[in-house]
Amino acid sequence: MEDSLDTRLYPEPSLSQVGSWRVSSLPSGSPQLPSPTGPSLETARAHILALGPQQLLAQDEEGDTLLHLFAARGLRWAAYAAAEVLQMYRQLDIREHKGKTPLLVAAAANQPLIVEDLLSLGAEPNATDHQGRSVLHVAATYGLPGVLSAVFKSGIQVDLEARDFEGLTPLHTAVLALNAAMLPASVCPRMQNSQARDRLTCVQMLLQMGASHTSQEIKSNKTILHLAVQAANPTLVQLLLGLPRGDLRAFVNMKAHGNTALHMAAALPPGPPQEAIVRHLLAAGADPTLRNLENEQPVHLLRPGPGPEGLRQLLKRSRTAPPGLSS
């Protein structure tokens, strides 16, 4: 694009500048900006207004406007000034070639302040890209608790049960992302631990925001408990079984194409994670007498050999013990 704004005028805020800004203290209207060592919001507004609406609405070969580019680079002052103009032309949700609005671009770039600004200016909070992913899906996919916090603090209603084109809610997406971060990988352990921590935080935040833990993904009817068990993640299983709402026994015995979480746990490779998960499920009221579509009980899905023999005896005892007495 010709005569585009020189984005070098709008450096990304330093951590100290970001830290001095507080969402909770904002009134409606323009954000209260710290005193940065660089251009102010008024300076950004002057440059944006000088460009005129034609250049602000122009899209490059990938469909990006200047607002998309500012959001992607974390150029907050320029993004806010550009968004004000696009708001006047009802183009705040203009899409690039993958269907991403500036809000979705800001979320993917992990720019929670810009996410907060765009929402305050009227960006559509439930907009989705060409994969059906909302701002919550994006934050869940990449493990971005700051973005989730920005959405939550905005006070704007968002659809926590929205489905992407894979049939996943943001909570399903967050659990799958957490499971992936905990798999053995070539990345350094410190980076892997950081990813897992952020993604676990996203799971917890979505639950606190009111996401339904009983929602089933469309393709195979799995709940987040099934997904956690399938990934042999005893820590997450224990967290989900400790949720303080709903009928725990009904939740733990929900079926995904005929299989309960206990069926899936019994089919895991033998080892400490499997044993911990089976014990957690039984303690929460999992019914070892339920059968799947192949008429199998969980005990029938244990792998042969001496490894799972202790679990075999436990499941057999639990089939005849009164509820709550299995151990």
UniProtKB/Swiss-Prot annotation:
Disruption phenotype: Mice are highly sensitive to LPS-induced endotoxin shock and susceptible to intestinal inflammation caused by exposure to microflora. They display no overt T-cell selection phenotype but an impaired proliferation of T-cells. Thymocytes and T-cells seem to produce less IL-2 and IFNG. ANK repeats lie at residues 62-97, 98-127, 131-160, 166-215, 220-250, 257-290. It comes from the Eukaryota. Induction: Up-regulated in thymocytes upon TCR-triggered cell death (at protein level). Up-regulated by IL-10 or LPS. GO terms for biological process: inflammatory response; negative regulation of canonical NF-kappaB signal transduction; negative regulation of T cell differentiation in thymus; positive regulation of T-helper 17 cell differentiation; positive regulation of thymocyte apoptotic process; T cell differentiation in thymus; T cell receptor signaling pathway; thymocyte apoptotic process. The keyword Nucleus applies. Specifically expressed in spleen and at low levels in thymus. Expressed in a population of antigen-presenting dendritic cells which may act as regulators of systemic inflammatory response. Residues 1-40, 293-327 are annotated as: Disordered. InterPro entries: Ankyrin_rpt, Ankyrin_rpt-contain_sf. It is found in: Nucleus. SUPFAM superfamilies: Ankyrin repeat. Gene3D superfamilies: Ankyrin repeat-containing domain (1.25.40.20). It holds the Pfam family Ank_2. One of its GO terms (cellular component) is nucleus. Residues 14-23 have a biased composition (Polar residues). Keywords: ANK repeat, Inflammatory response, Nucleus, Repeat. One of its GO terms (molecular function) is NF-kappaB binding. PROSITE patterns: ANK_REP_REGION (PS50297), ANK_REPEAT (PS50088). Interacts with NFKB1, RELA and RELB; in the nucleus. Belongs to the NF-kappa-B inhibitor family. Regulates the expression of IL-2, IL-6, and other cytokines through regulation on NF-kappa-B activity. Functions in the regulation of inflammatory responses. Involved in the induction of T helper 17 cells (Th17) differentiation upon recognition of antigen by T cell antigen receptor (TCR). According to PubMed:11931770, it may also regulate TCR-induced negative selection of thymocytes. This is NF-kappa-B inhibitor delta.
